[in-house]
Amino acid sequence: MKKFTAISAVSLLLVACGESRPTYLLSGTVDTLYDGATVSLLYGEKSDSTVVSQGAFSFEGEIDAPVLARVLISQGDNRTGGMVVLEAGSPVLTLTEEGYRCSGTPLNETLNGFNASSQELYKTYREAYTSLREQGLKDEEFRAALEQAGETFSAGSRKLNEEFFAANRDNVLGSIVITRLADGKSQFDSLYNVAGEAVRNAASVQQEKARYENLEKTSEGKMFTDFTIEKGSAEGTPVSLSDYVGKGKYVLVDFWASWCGPCRGEMPNLAEVYKKYKGDRFEIVGVAVWDERADTEKALESLPITWPVIFDAGQLPTDLYGINGIPQIILFGPDGTIVARNLRGEELKARLAELLGK
């Protein structure tokens, strides 16, 4: 019996040791004007919160592996925050009017260096812009010189991002730049394939991977993907994309939001083609995404929208169609096949004229 007890005790000790997880203690300092404000710590699908007291706050927890997190603080009209790496140790986040800095742990120090280099590049570009303005150049000369300065800045930024990814593709920091470097699915896949598990498993990278997969599923020539918004109709009843698409008409679906300037700018074009083609062969449907219903309803009072609108669609449609920017205007054929994506302005008018006649 004693022997069994001794062995059991050793086994329990080993199990306990095996269950030990890295811990972090994140301390932060901020202007005392934020005293009493809620501080949010967001990472992946997890979150934590605390309150600023005497210009300070802290978070403590366990992690399986280093993870990127955002710290957000708001007090009235004042907002601040920064990105940190939650990793074993005691990182210290300092928030000032000039920006933020997190020190005290290896990956956070690496991130500081990258942020400093990025800021230096932007500073150089801003100085070039100011210098050009002061030279009194003619408009054409100014635009040409500014374009050259912009190209230099873009090339420098890409080089910095490429070097940072190469040096950090096996830790979570590599996930910061992989989406910046990828211009399309092919480039994303190439970067993803050489990245380590820490980068591949990062929430932002998984989201981008899913977006490209959904973008492929909803590319031109593919059948439409249906979705239902439970209170999406004007009356607050369920409405589906299939209520309109695949019913024998060409249907132009505009994914938009009330706060989106380019979305509003496209409305006159949509109103023009709707007036011209509305009927047995053509319909427009607006899908309000990333927007509050009340804001959409208010916007409709001043916009030339006379076509059906699906309200309060949130992120569901944009996820399904791989959309990361609006407006996104997609044309569906009479059978529900996707005819074209990214239609705007004159290109939109020309495509409809081709299909429906002038």
Labelled PLM ranges:
Residues 228-251:
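A short beta-strand-turn-helix
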Residues 248-251, 255-259, 325:
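Short pre-active-site segment immediately N-terminal to redox-active cysteine/selenocysteine motifs
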Residues 264-303, 310-320, 350:
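Structural microenvironment flanking redox-active thiols in thiol-disulfide oxidoreductases
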Residues 17-159:
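A non-transmembrane, solvent-exposed segment enriched in polar/low-complexity residues
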Residues 299-305, 312-357:
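Thiol/disulfide oxidoreductase modules built on the thioredoxin-like
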Residues 1-15:
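Sec-dependent bacterial lipoprotein signal peptides
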Residues 52, 232-233, 332-333:
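Short, acidic, Ser/Thr-enriched surface-loop or helix-capping motifs
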